[in-house]
Amino acid sequence: MLYHEKFDVIVVGGGHAGTEAALASARTGQSTLLLTHNIDTLGQMSCNPAIGGIGKGHLVKEVDAMGGLMAQAIDHAGIQFRTLNASKGPAVRATRAQADRALYKAFVRNVLENTPNLTLFQQSVDDLIVEQDQVVGVVTQMGLKFRANAVVLTVGTFLGGKIHIGMESSSGGRAGDPPSIALADRLRDLPFRVDRLKTGTPPRIDARSVDFSELEVQHGDNPTPVFSFMGNRAQQPRQIPCYITHTNENTHDVIRANLDRSPMYAGVIEGIGPRYCPSIEDKVMRFADKNSHQIFIEPEGLTTHELYPNGISTSLPFDVQVKIVHSMKGFENAHIVRPGYAIEYDFFDPRDLKLTYETKFIKGLFFAGQINGTTGYEEAAAQGLMAGLNASLFTQGKEGWSPRRDQAYMGVLIDDLSTMGTKEPYRMFTSRAEYRLLLREDNADIRLTEKSRELGLVDDARWTRFNEKMENMEKERQRLKETWINPKSEDIDQLNQILKTPMSREASGEDLLRRPEMTYSQLTSLDRFGPALEDQQASEQVEIQVKYDGYIQRQQDEIEKSLRHENTKLPADIDYSKVKGLSNEVVLKLTTAKPDSIGIASRISGITPAAISILLVYLKKHGLLKKGEEA
């Protein structure tokens, strides 16, 4: 049966990638259908109850700067907020929050149900309708056909999903949910490169069975940080602590004695797991010299007794899981309410994607989230937003858009995936970005909101707030530049008490703020340089921009040099075997990768600077270089 309404964009999957994709498409005015196997699981946190962290918090802020949902959802559902790396420089500071799962899911669903241009429908998708190498719709489990100009697949761990607990395995997309077998089979028939990955989750614990007096308490920050540029602390629910315990030699002995019952070590699981979130059995074997591992005990919400022991993800049999839990301090009598498990699933080589997340083989088909080999809610949300935006642009006949590596962590993410691919679940870190001093959490809106407004993603309220902040920053910097003090001023003693060395010559407010010992709040506490801005986001920007001005300018200069050929287009029909001087290896890699630009080609493993020079000469010879791209 053909559904009566044709949509502009169909999004398959209602997780963190799917919700952002559907909302981005709908926000840009496209009629959008979100298909999910279960409407009650929209926005569900399948693994740990937390958002943010190093590199990840940066992605959340970028999603927010572009009008996305994740930051606002966690501001309304976060039960403990912390700034990580608070003592370090602003480039690597990151926000992280524990979430109340129920509050988070409820907030997401409420937004989805009340978004114009967005229709929700509960059905699993079994097939794609493809005509002349272009997707034109989907077929659901009960044979319903929905037609659209573009389809975004955000299917998480559901493609060919298999759950492992010990040597027992069963089909599943996650505990309690069926996998997508028919869709996985259909995608394997298409010309994509496919492989398997693995992830896992720990057993959940009943808090009433834990002796908290034996645990170390970990409180959140006070005052709490806020994720969204539109958020405020009044939106946050009641704050509660987390706790810390440790594994010990007894724990490790239990694990080592039962490795023959681990599906990972017995060769049952073929997929590679996440390097930066390994299972407890992996940690014990890889770090054999360590006799203890820190385990973070995270509450799952304000109205549940469930605890998430972050650090003991496992696929060992349930009886072994019980022994592991009971071996830890404070957990001697702990009751497990849900067993831990590993899940193996299909992913598709992201080198088969364009920078817009559109697949290279099927027009109008976009992939986002774990299907691309990533791990993490934040990475999924960032991909979902970009895929949804570009699906919308595709349906409008407009050129796609993706930020560059120097503009956003989102740009680093898709560039890494589409040029290098991945053999293990990909996680974002600040260390992956060359220009991280420019890609800070605090300036995500300055980097992305104006472009997002142009693309139709940002509403009037956010745009008004953004312009207000920019105006406040500009006025405050001008005020500090124009306010001077000299060593003979009457109020010089007040200033010298703050400075490490007394003033010897006249200085402006900006000159003083550049000094490492001077903060904006200290400076504006002085009568001459007060009052401070009430807009805290703007004052934070003023301080960072003034203090790091030289370093920021240096990175900007580096970027301008590297961008000279970054966007030089490579024709889609170029025959690299006809480019004289390229080695057979380079020809093969370029033909396989089909890079869109010189910048992308330069980051493919094995493509040398000499090969790039040969390509530029070829492009110039054939009149394919624009003015300013020569040499």
Curated annotation (Swiss-Prot):
GO terms for cellular component: cytosol. The keyword tRNA processing applies. SUPFAM superfamilies: FAD/NAD(P)-binding domain. NAD(+) binds at residues 273-287. Disulfide bonds: none annotated. GO terms for biological process: tRNA methylation; tRNA wobble uridine modification. Its cofactor is FAD. Belongs to the MnmG family. This is tRNA uridine 5-carboxymethylaminomethyl modification enzyme MnmG.
